[in-house]
Amino acid sequence: MSDTDELLEATTALILPLLHALDALNQAGRLMHPPALQEVVSAIGPYRDPLEEGRQVFTQVQWPEHLEAFTLHANMATTLALRAFDGFASAMDQAEPPMAAYRAMGLATQAYAAAYPLAAMLPPMNRFYLENDAREDEELQRKLMEADTEQPNVGVMHADNASDQRGGFSVYVPEYYQGETLPLVVALHGGSGHGRQFLWSWLRAV
């Protein structure tokens, strides 16, 4: 097997189960309702082990230096997703299961954020950050994949909005933005949330 084939095999081994895992965690967030917590936990449980198996394959490969950013974000997203699954799995054994599940949802949100840079590298990951009906929009996907993500003031940005800060904001500007007039969408998360995480609940819609 050539080095290229080995890298492709390792990428496939991880990215497909990672996508399935992120989709499952996203669905868990949508369906999260304390009386139905056990049902949610049972539904997403089967997606954890394939992700762990993919991670084992992925981390056994010697990755070249120019793919450092790719491997960094893939590993970060995988680790956070696995922690989210474990958080959901153990939630029913905690003193306050709903609160434990909400903490797991926070880890899932961090996994979405960690995986986002992969959207500019891999079309399947790009589609994950689109609404279902937009996943068939080839023109939109082309614009996103061809966009210059290094240009200033596009993508996901945070202003005084680290996880331990209050009073700041997070903003998303489509990576294909070229100065044209675009609508402004303002989303408020409420007093108990944090904008840095809340952004990932509405990014697909914009």
Language-model features, listed with the residues they occupy:
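Short substrate-entry loop that stabilizes the transition state in hydrolases
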Residues: 176-206
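A domain-start/cap signature at the N-terminus of enzymes
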Residues: 1-53, 60, 66-182
